[in-house]
Amino acid sequence: MKRKFKSGLALLTVLAMGMSLAGCGGSGDTTAAEEGALTNNGNYIFATGGTSGTYYPLGGAMATIINGAVEGTNITVQSTGASKENIMLVSKGEADYAIVQNDVLDYADKGIQLFEGEKITGVSTVASIYPEIVQLVVGADSGIKTVADLKGKRVSIGDAGSGVEANALQVLEAYGMTVDDVNVSRLSFKESGNAFKDNQLDPFFVTAGVPNTAIVELAVTRPVQLLNIDGAEAEKLVADYPFYTTIAIPKDVYGTPEDISTIAVRAIIVSRADLNETEVYNFTKALYENLPTLGEAHAKGKEILLEQATDGVTVALHPGAAKYFSEVGVG
């Protein structure tokens, strides 16, 4: 099986993190059980995202912790183009673990949206880790108060074929609209931000963690407000698309007058379905037993909660992960 390693930067990052985390051990070593041969002699590739994003450094911190906690394990972090590429890498056996958005995995499993006509197999869920929030940004002076007010407005729904576009279309659908009801643009987040600053856009969609630095920076030049996605429409979205969860953005995140109610997908860890139960069990156990250390290494680690480990999961848990969550009463 061909396995692709990118530049040594990823490995160097993990080693550097290992030095910074030395002496910050969690609840003790997790020794691999004797049953079940280790895949690739315990050497694993962890596909993440771009080096300037969240997935890559967070994955590096996870790898360092798990390498130190599980005897015989050597996880190397790989920089990638994020969710869609990661799912393909894991499906082909070119990566063993990956971080992806749960909605994108759902599309892959069903062969729809970004994966139209190419249903993906061989990928299991390990854990749901933190929310990626659907944010609908408008100018504070735009006069747009609700999603229903988007009719006839200039709206960016994200790059064509992106996860953001899929989220935006689903939100419009829940409110009884399609792209025919708005003056639609399919722009990247950077392009949307530039157009928004130049008053060439009314609202735009972004799916990301909060606070989103780019939104904070935009607010300096043009005051922003976020729209609520709530009520019966949010309930419909969660019912129709189980990868969504409801969530509130506290008012102090962006300085909004009140908390914003919206929906979120989840960043999740996936694995090859053919990894044996023991190695995925040990990976999962080591991760959750060392969350305080992970939180010290990366801010997103503080958002990972054991009780949310199965939130928004629509593709089956790997048996090793399911075993651990059963032991600790989750799911």
Predicted regions and their residues:
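Extracytoplasmic
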Residues: 41, 70-72, 82-85, 92, ...
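Bilobed "Venus flytrap"/periplasmic-binding protein-like clamshell domains
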Residues: 41-69, 73-77, 132-198, 315, ...
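Acidic, polar ligand-binding/catalytic clefts
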Residues: 95-130, 212
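Short, low-complexity disordered leader/linker segments with a strong preference
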Residues: 1-43
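Conserved N-terminal glycine/acidic-rich loop preference
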Residues: 36-45, 54-61, 84-105, 135
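Segments of small-molecule ligand-sensing domains
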Residues: 260-331
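Pocket-lining segment of extracytoplasmic ligand-binding domains
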Residues: 102-104, 110-114, 142, 179-269, ...
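Sec-exported extracytoplasmic/periplasmic mature domains
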Residues: 63-71, 91-95, 110, 155, ...
